[in-house]
């Protein structure tokens, strides 16, 4: 068994994630894709851990298995296909539904089944299943960043596994008897304080490692369905299946009020002709409230920090409930902290200024796949336009154009 990772008192979920990711990378345990940070980490003995699934009675007796698409679960998907079980995988980002069913071609041999179990096979050999499909899943296999012997689980922070399970409850695909299994390296089994768990967090019944099968005997209740008071309008827009499930539960007389139920539905469709609301000044200084700087002056300040054209990264589709401090924390965790951050929360976007184009492109790579509360963020280089002879300047992006390029409003950011 791998030496344990120490979890300090008062640590957060993100602290635990970072410790696990760092440990796997620093101890040469990681396998492709790398780095493992901000992923369900793949590890070198993942297939050995996955083979333990065939020793579980629930695997032998079930015919429908739902397995997440994470790389370290590839061996479980292969085992399910080889056992001729119905293999369900989540629809990518839940954009078009909940499940895809893997359908190997007739007469598929072991090599073809192996391909079907990979991420490419999920794309090439799966068909979507509608909400009305009669599905009864007795076994759910999820990836984890960390898990405790008590069954407490921590994912990569996007909430998809929790959301998928809650959706399955709502559509009647799982019951209280459904067994949840996770596959991890031994080092990922850590002490997780129960106070970090929330009502929507999914727990596990079995932990499979390369050396052990751990039965958790977890008594904590699994999610009983979608907690609508935690769902935002942005999430409803990004995950269309939620609207269908909301309509179903509304007709059944359930309270389906959203977290931001009084918020305007036009938030994500607001005109792009808007000026910044909150902005950190060059080199991290805070600009005074409602102070207007001429663009030539702003250009001079940027030059003082040696910022260059093309060194600005645009982040869009930011949920309206996100605070600037949350975004800054995520940027630091991914090693993508900018010299200057322009926050436009009402328009669901932000601009990150880096010292040069190389740093901006490195930030793009670090921010790949970033999401908040299950909502994928749009991250791309912002197209910039330097001042011309008349001093006019503005940022150009497919979602931003300044209405009056002669001034930029830069309110103070509360600390």
Curated annotation (Swiss-Prot):
<dbReference type="InterPro" id="IPR012677">
    <property type="entry name" value="Nucleotide-bd_a/b_plait_sf"/>
</dbReference>
<dbReference type="GO" id="GO:0003723">
    <property type="term" value="F:RNA binding"/>
</dbReference>
<dbReference type="Pfam" id="PF01812">
    <property type="entry name" value="5-FTHF_cyc-lig"/>
</dbReference>
<feature type="region of interest" description="Disordered">
    <location>
        <begin position="388"/>
        <end position="415"/>
    </location>
</feature>
<feature type="domain" description="RRM">
    <location>
        <begin position="311"/>
        <end position="384"/>
    </location>
</feature>
<dbReference type="InterPro" id="IPR000504">
    <property type="entry name" value="RRM_dom"/>
</dbReference>
<dbReference type="InterPro" id="IPR035979">
    <property type="entry name" value="RBD_domain_sf"/>
</dbReference>
<dbReference type="InterPro" id="IPR002698">
    <property type="entry name" value="FTHF_cligase"/>
</dbReference>
<keyword id="KW-0694">RNA-binding</keyword>
<dbReference type="InterPro" id="IPR037171">
    <property type="entry name" value="NagB/RpiA_transferase-like"/>
</dbReference>
<feature type="region of interest" description="Disordered">
    <location>
        <begin position="252"/>
        <end position="272"/>
    </location>
</feature>
<dbReference type="InterPro" id="IPR034359">
    <property type="entry name" value="MTHFSD_RRM"/>
</dbReference>
<feature type="compositionally biased region" description="Polar residues">
    <location>
        <begin position="390"/>
        <end position="415"/>
    </location>
</feature>
<dbReference type="InterPro" id="IPR024185">
    <property type="entry name" value="FTHF_cligase-like_sf"/>
</dbReference>
<dbReference type="GO" id="GO:0005737">
    <property type="term" value="C:cytoplasm"/>
</dbReference>
<protein>
    <recommendedName>
        <fullName>Methenyltetrahydrofolate synthase domain-containing protein</fullName>
    </recommendedName>
</protein>
């Amino acid at each position: 068994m791998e030496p344990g990772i120490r979890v300090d008192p008062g640590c957060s979920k993100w602290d635990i994630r970072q410790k696990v990711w760092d440990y796997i990378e620093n101890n040469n345990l990681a396998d492709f894709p790398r780095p493992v940070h901000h992923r369900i980490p793949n590890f070198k003995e993942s297939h050995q851990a996955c083979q333990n699934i065939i020793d579980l009675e629930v695997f032998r007796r079930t015919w429908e298995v739902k397995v997440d698409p994470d790389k370290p679960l590839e061996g479980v998907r292969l085992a399910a296909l080889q056992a001729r079980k119905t293999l369900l995988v989540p629809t990518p980002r839940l954009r078009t539904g909940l499940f895809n069913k893997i359908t190997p071609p007739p007469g598929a041999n072991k090599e073809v089944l192996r391909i079907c179990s990979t991420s490419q096979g999920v794309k090439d050999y799966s068909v979507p299943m509608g909400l009305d499909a009669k599905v009864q899943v007795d076994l759910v296999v999820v990836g984890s960043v960390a898990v405790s012997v008590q069954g407490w689980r921590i994912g990569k922070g996007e909430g998809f596994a929790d959301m998928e399970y809650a959706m399955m409850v709502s559509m009647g695909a799982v019951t209280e008897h459904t067994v949840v299994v996770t596959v991890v390296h031994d080092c990922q089994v850590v002490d997780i304080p129960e106070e970090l768990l929330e009502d929507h967090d999914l727990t596990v019944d079995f932990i499979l490692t390369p050396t052990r099968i751990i039965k958790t005997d977890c008594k904590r209740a699994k999610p009983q369905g979608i907690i609508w008071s935690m769902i935002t309008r942005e999430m409803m827009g990004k995950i269309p299946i939620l609207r269908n499930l909301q309509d179903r539960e509304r007709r059944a007389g359930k309270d389906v009020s959203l977290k931001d139920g009084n918020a305007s539905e036009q938030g994500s469709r607001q005109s792009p002709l808007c000026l910044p609301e909150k902005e950190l000044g060059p080199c991290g200084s805070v600009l005074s409230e409602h102070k207007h700087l001429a663009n030539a002056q702003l250009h001079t300040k940027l030059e003082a920090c040696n910022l260059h054209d093309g060194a600005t990264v645009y982040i869009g589709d930011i949920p309206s409930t996100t605070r600037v401090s949350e975004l800054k924390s995520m940027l630091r965790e991914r090693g993508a902290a900018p010299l200057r951050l322009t926050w436009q929360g009402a328009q669901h976007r932000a601009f990150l200024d880096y010292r040069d184009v190389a740093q901006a492109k490195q930030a793009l790579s670090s921010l790949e796949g970033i999401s908040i509360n299950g909502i994928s963020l749009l991250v791309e280089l912002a197209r910039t336009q330097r001042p011309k002879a008349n001093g006019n300047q503005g940022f150009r992006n497919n979602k931003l154009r300044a209405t009056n390029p002669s001034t930029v409003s830069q309110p103070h950011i509360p600390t």
